[in-house]
């Protein structure tokens, strides 16, 4: 496939382009500027200027104005934060921050962690796509390692989702609501969501429902797509918030989500391993239930000023069925496959804060305890039917089904942290220390032990201490710089420790690794922030070194006893990721100018090759106009992405998506006092392009490439009624 001329965006060019496209700014501090408050960095509310890290905040209003309906839309204008894709069938796997993704990024909804991602082969993929864009109040993204507060699962960062409280909908009254209907041309999808807030600040209820139905995404490179994908997702949200007689607050929440997707993957037929396949269809079901109870307590002057205790339970249940008809094979067969994945998470969390002040200094002390259990069960089944004789067998490629890829496993994580924020004069010093203990306990699983008699079950007990130290210096009332060091930690996952696979037909075998070590990271962030009357700017330079990075299914060589080619999860010596993040905004009368930029480079120090999880440089620029009465607005967004060339191709040549510039136009129009009409035109120039995260690992001649291109010019529209 020929490569189009790409954009050449160096880090300096990225930032320079943004500066040149914005009008000059006079740096004048404004003490009255409303400061942005975030929770994710310290688990309590703080001004973003009191945090020694880079945090991105996305609000419900912003997502509505951008007509976001999926997790792919949520982060499309946040350089350095990407969705991880799994082809036309499975959709979004997870979220990537600064080149680190998968289960190394903690995703929490109302403080509750979401289930893990796990995949094996081409027909089994338990994704983490459980975030419903229709029921988000705001999203906070903490860039970089965050193990000092969040433990083993946050070595790559944190994505914290908050659903609406009743007060977010009720306002000053006793009831309120929000109804939103959105249609998108690119996948012919409809999303309807309704949020209702009842009560007041002392006793309130949020009730929300969201329903989304859509089809395959149109591809600009394959206008007559062979693939089809029909999806349906429904989500229910209930949240009760009540104050007791002591002035403390109780919260109880329930989220239920279920999704069903039918896919026809005809684009893969007739080539490679599917050269004899005449039909390939998927039937996938997903369900997630989350229960959360929290108690916010305390009063100034007591032994603690404030605190929150939380208990939660979450279960994810995924079932994926595949029909693989091989009508052109020497012996035509119809193969039915089943993949099932279930994970239960239950946990307790306690966070306490105390303020201490003297004439010259102020301390904010934090103390936290975490307890979390996960139980994970997975299996695959298969049945091959001779299309001529009707004869059936459960042996496929030498594998005898049903089977597990790892035993039923339980993990226990216990963590405790202490944090002190010391302020004196223009200086703030933040020191934190967390201790973690991790236990992996595989069960004596009869199915697993029968399938893999060569495997020895691996039990693990790991512990680590994660320090963090940050310094903030306020140069002026509106300007500050910060420097932070943070240590990250990730215990060996259950799947990597005990992964097993045995395919006699191809003569290879994957075996457990009892010697896996915990991953660790040491990250440094140097940042600058400025906040003016109607303008702001941020710049962050980061460098993170990862040691003992776990790579799944590393080739070991031939086993002299069995003659099989062996694979095993292994620790890499060292990898490094470093880069720059920047953002800015300027308001001049009716016009606004904003932008953000990202550049990163990742290197595997074992072979000095690039990391393929680190995407290309990117810059996002925006120009907006609002009428004097603020009832009408226009926004033009441009996304400039460089060609993706810094990659490891030692295992074979990879497809190189060209650089591209994409322009989107949005209109917001108020109709009356309670209704808002929004419309969007996407990819105005009808550009054919690929997102890097959609085509990772694919060769230049992969037949599925045309079907993974983004949509050409498309439209979307929404109608929003609130009261």
Please place each PLM-identified region on the residue numbering.
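Flexible loop and strand-edge segments within Gram-negative outer membrane beta-barrel domains
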Residues: 229, 247-304, 316-343
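Extracytoplasmic beta-strand/coil segments of soluble accessory domains associated
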Residues: 40, 72, 76-116
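Outer-membrane beta-barrel signature, preferentially recognizing the C-terminal barrel domain
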Residues: 273-300, 405-411, 457-466, 470, ...
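Short acidic/polar hinge/loop motifs at secondary-structure boundaries
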Residues: 114-143
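Gram-negative outer-membrane beta-barrel transporters
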Residues: 354, 359, 365, 423-429, ...
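Signature of Gram-negative outer-membrane beta-barrel scaffolds
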Residues: 362-478, 502, 596
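Transmembrane beta-barrel wall of Gram-negative outer-membrane proteins
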Residues: 183-213, 223-264, 283-298, 359, ...
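Surface-exposed extracellular loop regions of Gram-negative outer-membrane beta-barrel proteins
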Residues: 258-262, 266-273, 317, 439-450, ...
């Amino acid at each position: 496939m020929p490569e189009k001329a790409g954009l050449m965006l160096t880090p300096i060019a990225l930032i320079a382009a943004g500066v040149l496209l914005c009008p000059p700014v006079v740096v004048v501090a404004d003490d009255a500027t409303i400061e942005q408050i975030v929770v994710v960095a310290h688990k309590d509310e703080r001004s973003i200027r009191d945090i020694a890290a880079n945090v991105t905040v996305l609000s419900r209003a912003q997502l509505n104005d951008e007509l976001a309906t999926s997790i792919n839309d949520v982060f499309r204008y946040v350089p350095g934060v990407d969705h991880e894709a799994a082809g036309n069938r499975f959709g979004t796997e997870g979220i990537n921050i600064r080149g680190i993704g998968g289960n190394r990024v903690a995703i929490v909804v109302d403080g509750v962690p979401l289930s893990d991602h796990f995949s094996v082969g081409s027909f089994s993929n338990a994704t983490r796509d459980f975030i419903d864009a229709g029921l988000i109040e705001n999203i906070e993204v903490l860039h970089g390692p965050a193990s000092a507060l969040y433990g083993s699962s946050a070595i790559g960062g944190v994505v914290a989702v908050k659903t609406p409280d009743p007060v977010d909908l009720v306002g000053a009254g006793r009831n309120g609501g929000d109804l939103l209907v959105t249609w998108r041309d690119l996948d012919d999808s409809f999303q309807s969501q309704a949020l209702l807030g009842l009560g007041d600040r002392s006793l309130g209820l949020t009730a929300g429902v969201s329903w989304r139905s859509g089809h395959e995404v149109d591809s600009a490179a394959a206008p007559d797509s062979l693939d089809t994908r029909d999806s349906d997702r429904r989500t229910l949200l209930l949240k009760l918030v009540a104050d007791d007689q002591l002035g403390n607050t109780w919260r109880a929440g329930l989220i239920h989500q279920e999704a069903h997707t039918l896919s026809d993957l005809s684009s893969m037929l007739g080539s490679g391993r599917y050269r004899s396949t005449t039909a390939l269809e998927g039937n996938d079901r997903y369900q997630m239930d989350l229960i959360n109870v929290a108690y916010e307590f305390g009063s100034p002057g007591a032994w603690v000023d404030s605190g929150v205790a939380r208990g939660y339970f979450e279960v994810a249940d995924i079932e994926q069925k595949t029909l693989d008809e091989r009508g052109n094979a020497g012996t035509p067969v119809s193969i039915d496959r089943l993949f099932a994945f279930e994970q239960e998470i239950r946990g307790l969390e306690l966070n306490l804060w105390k303020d201490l002040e003297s004439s010259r200094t102020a301390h904010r002390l934090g103390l936290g305890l975490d307890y979390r259990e996960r139980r994970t069960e997975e299996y695959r089944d298969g049945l091959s039917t001779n299309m001529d004789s009707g004869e059936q067998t459960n042996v496929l490629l030498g594998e005898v089904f049903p089977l597990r890829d790892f035993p039923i496993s339980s993990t226990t994580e216990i963590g405790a942290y202490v944090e002190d924020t010391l302020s004196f004069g223009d200086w703030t010093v933040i020191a934190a220390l967390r201790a973690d203990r991790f236990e992996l306990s595989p069960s004596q699983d009869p199915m697993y032990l029968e399938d893999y008699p060569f495997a020895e079950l691996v039990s693990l007990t790991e512990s680590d201490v994660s320090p963090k130290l940050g310094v903030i210096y306020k140069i002026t009332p509106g300007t500050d710089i910060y420097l932070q060091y943070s240590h990250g930690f990730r215990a060996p996952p259950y799947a990597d420790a005990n992964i097993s696979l045995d395919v006699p037909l191809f003569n290879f075998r994957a075996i457990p690794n009892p010697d896996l070590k915990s991953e660790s990271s040491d990250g440094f962030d140097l940042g600058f922030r400025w906040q003016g009357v109607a303008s702001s700017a941020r710049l962050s330079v980061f460098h993170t070194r990862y040691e003992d990075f776990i790579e799944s299914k590393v080739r070991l060589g031939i086993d002299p006893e069995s003659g099989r080619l062996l694979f095993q999860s292994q620790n890499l010596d060292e990898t490094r990721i470093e880069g720059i993040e920047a953002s800015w905004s300027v308001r001049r009368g009716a016009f606004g100018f904003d932008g953000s930029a990202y550049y990163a480079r990742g290197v595997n120090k074992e072979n000095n090759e690039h990391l393929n999880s680190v995407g290309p440089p990117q810059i996002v620029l925006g120009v907006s106009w609002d009428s004097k009465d603020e009832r009408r607005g226009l926004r033009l967004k441009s996304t400039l992405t460089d060609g993706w060339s810094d990659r490891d191709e030692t295992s074979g040549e990879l497809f190189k998506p060209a650089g591209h510039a994409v322009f989107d136009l949005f209109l917001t129009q108020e109709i009356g006092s309670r209704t808002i009409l929004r419309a969007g035109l996407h990819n105005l120039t009808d550009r054919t392009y690929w997102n890097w995260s959609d085509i990772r690992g694919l060769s230049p001649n992969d037949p599925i490439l045309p079907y993974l291109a983004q949509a050409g010019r498309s439209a979307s529209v929404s109608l929003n009624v609130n009261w």
